[in-house]
Amino acid sequence: MTFDKGSLILVDYTAKVKDDGEVFDTTIEADAKKHSLHEENVKYHPKLVSIGETSYPVLKGFDEALAKTSVGDKLTVEVTPDKGFGERDSKKVRMIPIRKLGEDAEKVSVGDTIEVDNKRGTIRYIGSGRVQIDYNHRYAGKTILFDVNVLKSLDSSNDKVGAILKERLPVEDTKIAFDLKDKEVSVTVPEEILRADGLQIMKHFIQLDIFKFVKTLEKISFVETHINKQAPANKPEAKEKTPEQKTV
């Protein structure tokens, strides 16, 4: 059984460059640690993919291969540059005076990613007072291999809502809670992100995605509970002491 356009699926994968075997992306924490990619603030969990859709996209070649798979499949997908990160374009490689980097001039080295003129590029050469910056994608011109495990097809409304929240909310999965009843869903906003920058944007995209992929829903509510942490704690009232009786 293959997947139709718009299907939501969960996959685990590890991606590497075919030529030299460089591993640069993974959903699996053990692989991230093994290849020195691990980051403490990154959530390692199966990736949510929307087949043929832009909501939760992957590289075109990867998407096309996933559409032909079934749950339980384990395979290696080869993605060529034309359906991956694109071909290299020599026009995107520029040589600039190193002084243009300002205070960063003495801090950068070959291989660093830097932003110049509002564009991000990779430093390829430093010398003679000049810096060569490559504005191609770091893996442009490279064939990519994905070792992938197709874990689950999200078919129920409950599974779809849960997966969307896990993908969109920057908290541990155990802190995500929602209540789905008939044509309504109530989403509890975790306390730790109540004051987070971009919360309204998160909520905006969550409701867009849920309405898009769970077409039976008519209403989404976001529940925010604010606790007054400055309120004085209630202390038990002290009992009135009885006068001590003295014996003569």
Please give the residue ranges for each predicted region.
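FKBP-type peptidyl-prolyl cis-trans isomerases
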Residues: 1-248
